[in-house]
Amino acid sequence: MTTVGVSLFRRSPEKITMKIATFLGLSFLLIASYVLICEAQHPGFQELLILEENMRDPENSKERSCAKPRENCNRMNILCCRGECVCPTFGDCFRYGD
């Protein structure tokens, strides 16, 4: 019984290094797959961040076009005007009062 327990702790450094490298490699692949899956489910995430940043910028609001009522923001790539239109995270753009 003691020889089995002792042999488990007498692993060569090469085997330990290989196990650690394998674990790190698989962890990296798992994280990369999560990132790719998230990007596939939310393809406009980067555009959304740019949209939110532009909507908070009052100096450049005249350079952006207002979306038509119920026009889909992500499909049309239209940045809403500050104060007149709202582009929610998901769904359609809408104007105040529509």
Curated annotation (Swiss-Prot):
It comes from the Eukaryota. Residues 41-64 form a propeptide. The keyword Transcription regulation does not apply. Disulfide bonds join C66-C81, C73-C85. Expressed by the venom gland. One of its GO terms (molecular function) is ion channel regulator activity. Keywords: Disulfide bond, Ion channel impairing toxin, Knottin, Secreted, Signal, Toxin. It is found in: Secreted. Its main location: secreted. Residues 1-40 form the signal peptide. GO terms for cellular component: extracellular region. Putative ion channel inhibitor. Belongs to the hainantoxin family. 17 subfamily. The presence of a 'disulfide through disulfide knot' structurally defines this protein as a knottin. This is Hainantoxin-XVII-2.
